[in-house]
Regions:
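N-terminal beta1-alpha1-beta2 module of alpha/beta enzyme domains
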Residues: 1-62
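Flexible, glycine-rich active-site loops centered on histidine and acidic residues
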Residues: 1-14, 72-95
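Structured beta->alpha junctions
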Residues: 41, 65-68, 72
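Alpha-helical scaffolding within the catalytic cores
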Residues: 45-49, 68, 78
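A short, GP-enriched loop/loop-strand-helix hinge that lies immediately N-terminal to
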Residues: 60-66, 92-93
Length: 95
């Protein structure tokens, strides 16, 4: 059975990003398959995944919602390609 988790810390609370990292690393250690972030006013979905990609090894990283109206299609594609490279192919683009 595959298990997915959500990791969304408010962008204004640095301490909660550290707590989310611990949460995701522990979930990865326990065999979770994927971590998802979403986008809303005040926080993008990609930056937290880049942070997590640098500090995890196996867990897949996905955007549950990436606002296509907030960025140009070319920027969405470039962002996805960059995060896929940074995460060694673990990134899943969800629109």
């Amino acid at each position: 059975m595959k298990i997915s988790i959500s990791a969304n810390a408010p962008p204004w609370k640095r301490q909660e990003f550290a707590e989310q990292l611990t949460y995701v690393q522990e979930a990865e250690r326990m065999g979770a398959d994927t971590v998802w972030t979403l986008e809303g006013w005040g926080q993008d979905a990609v930056t937290p995944l880049a942070y997590l990609a640098a500090r995890t090894h196996k867990i897949k990283l996905g955007t549950a919602i990436m606002q296509v109206t907030a960025r140009a299609p070319a920027m969405t594609a470039m962002t996805a390609m960059t995060l896929s490279a940074l995460s060694e192919g673990r990134f899943i683009l969800g629109l």
